[in-house]
Regions:
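Catalytic cores of RNA-modifying enzymes
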Residues: 1-169, 173-207
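Accessory RNA 3′-end/elbow-binding domains used by RNA modification enzymes
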Residues: 1-9, 18-35, 39, 43, ...
Length: 296
């Protein structure tokens, strides 16, 4: 198994992100797996699984923005903010598509959002969902988020409305669904959620667990083209090619002075085109941030 790669998975409904990792550990023959961006069990879609040395890339992604397709159900409010929870309020739906489309623009832009009780956000070291399961409510502080785009997609069923949302890391679509309901004057909850983009990864690059498990069992996963190189996640950064002397400095953690490049972060390659890792240039000094390539 490639010990430094990324496997984009189309997470199935009913699975936690941890469930996916647990299943893949056996199939891939390694325990060193990680993921970027937890998905709720009911949600489907993009879950990037980082393998081996690539796990160090998960928290270094330059792009953390997400895109979702979310179905909002009007007339129902639950304790979890989605249809898996216990109903807290029901009401007749007196609004429709026109009213929903009219309120969507007010949710665009930078704003503060209160994290839901059923979330992994920690207060005093304890995840909020643990307190929620005990019936407790913890005081929370709103957090800054950004919603870049909201597009109305249609109504798959009476009372259900689907939107596409492009947003920043840390945005809770369950909270957005409830807030849209509040703006409409009716209770609302999340009926379905599918993540179609997470940073550098798109749903078109993802494969289902049955597909991945079958390829792993057949011994064809390495040749499938489904395993992406770790530099895929850094594609938005400028590239820098270094000679053997600078390469040696990088591997040894030594800075290179008088380096001619603009200040900033770079993905670094050697003369043979092998991806080495990340480095920063500051006032003419090139300093390694992280090496992903194993020294030959």
């Amino acid at each position: 198994m490639n010990t430094c790669a990324i496997l984009p998975v189309d997470k199935p409904a009913g699975w936690t992100s941890f469930d996916v990792l647990a299943k893949l550990r056996g199939a891939l023959g390694t325990r060193r797996l990680g993921h970027a961006g937890t998905l709720d069990p009911m949600a489907t879609g993009v879950l990037a699984v980082f393998i081996g040395n690539a796990t160090a890339a998960a928290d270094r992604q330059p792009d953390h923005d997400k895109t979702y397709e979310a179905t909002i159900r009007l007339g129902l409010r639950t304790d979890t903010g989605d249809v898996t929870g216990t109903a807290l309020e029901t009401a007749p739906v007196t609004v429709g598509e026109a009213e929903l489309k009219a309120v969507l623009p007010q949710f665009m832009g930078r704003q503060m959002q209160l994290p839901p009780m059923y979330s992994a956000v920690k207060i005093n070291g304890q995840p909020l969902y643990k307190a929620a399961r005990k019936g407790q409510t913890v005081e929370r502080t709103p957090r800054p988020i950004a919603i870049y785009e909201i597009t109305y997609l249609g109504s798959p069923a009476p009372g259900d409305y689907t939107i596409r949302v492009s947003c920043s890391k840390g945005t809770y679509i369950r909270v957005l669904a409830e807030d849209i309901g509040t703006a409409l004057g009716v209770p609302a909850t999340l009926a379905a959620l599918r993540r179609t983009r997470a940073g550098a990864f798109k749903i078109e690059e993802c494969h289902t667990l049955p597909e991945i498990l079958a390829a792993a069992e057949a011994g064809t996963l390495q040749q499938s083209g489904w395993l992406l190189p770790v530099e895929h996640v850094f594609a938005s950064l400028p590239a820098l090619t270094v000679d053997d002397a600078v390469k040696k400095h990088l591997f040894n953690g030594c800075p290179t002075s008088h380096y001619r490049a603009q200040d900033g972060k770079y993905r670094v390659y050697d003369a043979a085109g092998t991806f080495l890792g990340l480095a920063n240039v500051t006032q003419g000094v090139l300093q390694v941030e992280k090496i992903f390539c194993e020294r030959a």
